[in-house]
Amino acid sequence: MASLGSAAAGEPATGAEAEPGPPAPPPPPPPPPAPSPSALGPLLPLQREPLYNWQATKASLKERFAFLFNSELLSDVRFVLGKGRGAAAAGGPQRIPAHRFVLAAGSAVFDAMFNGGMATTSAEIELPDVEPAAFLALLRFLYSDEVQIGPETVMTTLYTAKKYAVPALEAHCVEFLTKHLRADNAFMLLTQARLFDEPQLASLCLDTIDKSTVDAISAEGFTDIDIDTLCAVLERDTLSIRESRLFGAIVRWAEAECQRQQLAVTFGNKQKVLGKALSLIRFPLMTIEEFAAGPAQSGILSDREVVNLFLHFTVNPKPRVEYIDRPRCCLRGKECCINRFQQVESRWGYSGTSDRIRFTVNRRISVVGFGLYGSIHGPTDYQVNIQIIEYEKKQTLGQNDTGFSCDGTANTFRVMFKEPIEILPNVCYTACATLKGPDSHYGTKGLKKVVHETPAASKTVFLFFSSPGNNNGTSIEDGQIPEIIFYT
C-alpha cells in the first residue's frame, strides 16, 4: 500500500531518469460503487478485512452480535428489498447485509433456507413481499433481542415475524397492539388479527367492541372490514347498542362495499353485498317507531319482509319472522336464575289480569327475563306482556310484548326483555306478567327469601313481597313468575 508522499503508480521517481522499457499496463478499472445508503440508516462499507480488535470493546455476546447487525463486517449474504412497484420513489432497492449463522440460529425458516435440502447458495436473496423497515426490525431482534416497533410498522413486522417463524417477536407485536387497542381502532385491529390468525388479539378486539359498540362502529375503520368480520360481530349477543343504530351502521358499510366492488349504490346492490349480514340484524328487538323510521324506509328489505315485521309488532298472535329475537345482553359473566317456588301444581287461569310480585335485591344486578309456567293441556302458544316497574315511582323500566311456546310439562319457559334492566340494591320493584292462553301450571310453597351463590361472586339475596291488589292471585306463597333471570 502506497504511503503518503510516495510516487503514484506508473510514474518515475523524482530526480531519477526514466529508462526505456515496455509500455506501462493500463490502469486497473475503478472499484464498484458502494451500495446506496438505506433509507433506514446507512450501511457500513464493505469490509473484506475485519476491523482490528473490535471485539475487545464489546463486553458481552449480545453487544458483539448487535455490532454485526446491518453490517457488512463478516457478512455472507445480502437481502434485496424494495424491488418493483414503489422502489424508484424510495430511492431504489435496498441491500441489507446479514450473517447466515445468526439468522439460522434464530429462525427455522432461515435455517431451511441456508441449510436445508433446497438450500440457496446465492449471495443475494430478493424479498419482494417484505417491507425494509419490518425486515430490519426482525433482524435487529435476531441479533440483539431488541424490539423496535411503532404504530406505522407493527403490522408489517407482525407479518414478517410470522413469515420467518419468530414467535417471540410475534408476541411483542401482539402485546404492542393490545396496549394500543381502543374503540376507534378495534375493527381495524380485529381484521388484522383474523388475517394473521391471532385469536387472543381478536378476542380482545371483540371485547372492546362489545363494551364500546357505538364508538367502535362510528370509527372510520368500521366500513373497511370484510363481510366475514362483519358477520362475526353481528352474530354476537353481547353488543351494547340499539338494534336500530346497528342497522344504520351496516347500511353505511354496504355503501362503502358497493364502492369497493365498483357497483352502483342502489337498494338492490346494498342488499346484495350485505348477504347473510342482513339476516343477523334483530329487527324484532326494535320498537315499531324505530323500525318505521329506519329499516322500513331503507329500501333494503323487501315489501313482504316489511309487512311481516309490522304484523309482528302490531298483532297477536304474532306471525313468525325469519329474524333473531334473542336480546343482545351487553353484560359480562354468567347468566343466573333463581326460582322462588318449591313445588308445582296444576290449573292457573287467565282473564286479562296481570300476575305481579314485588322484590328487592341486596346488590346491583341486570334482569334480562322471567321464567314462566306453561299449559297443562299439552303444547301451546301464549301471548304475554312482561314488565318491571319501580314500585315507589310507578315507573316502567322495561317491557316486552311477546310470546312463548310450551310443551305441556311443568317446566318453566324463558320470556326475555329486549334489553337488560338495571336493578339497584334495596329498591323495591314489581315484576309483572300478563298472559293470554289456556290454564297453566303454577308454583306453591313460595319463599320470601332466595339466595343465589356462585364461587366467583358474592351472594345475591332476593326478598319477595306480595303486591297490593288482585294480581290474578299471585302472591309470595303461590302463583306465576317463578323465575327471575339476571346477570350480576
Curated annotation (Swiss-Prot):
Chief location bin: cytoplasm
Pathway annotation from the record: Protein modification; protein ubiquitination
A cellular-component GO term for this protein: protein-containing complex
Pfam families: BACK, BTB, PHR
Residue ranges, compositional bias (Low complexity): 1-19
Every BACK domain range: 190-290
Keywords, in A-Z order: Cytoplasm, Differentiation, Methylation, Myogenesis, Ubl conjugation pathway
Any single biological process term in GO: protein ubiquitination
Molecular-function annotations in GO: cullin family protein binding; identical protein binding
Modified residue annotations for Omega-N-methylarginine: R85
Region (Disordered): 1-42
Tissue spec. comment: Strongly expressed in heart and skeletal muscle. Weakly expressed in myoblast C2C12 cells, but strongly up-regulated upon their differentiation into myotubes.
Amino acid composition bias (Pro residues), ranges on this chain: 20-36
Domain BTB: 75-151
Location within or outside the cell: Cytoplasm
Binding partners and assembly: Interacts (via C-terminus) with TOP1. Interacts with TRIM5 isoform Delta. Interacts with CUL3.
Annotated function: Probable substrate-specific adapter of an E3 ubiquitin-protein ligase complex which mediates the ubiquitination and subsequent proteasomal degradation of target proteins. Seems to regulate expression levels and/or subnuclear distribution of TOP1, via an unknown mechanism. May play a role in mesenchymal differentiation where it promotes myogenic differentiation and suppresses adipogenesis.
Name of this chain's protein: BTB/POZ domain-containing protein 1
Native source species: Mus musculus
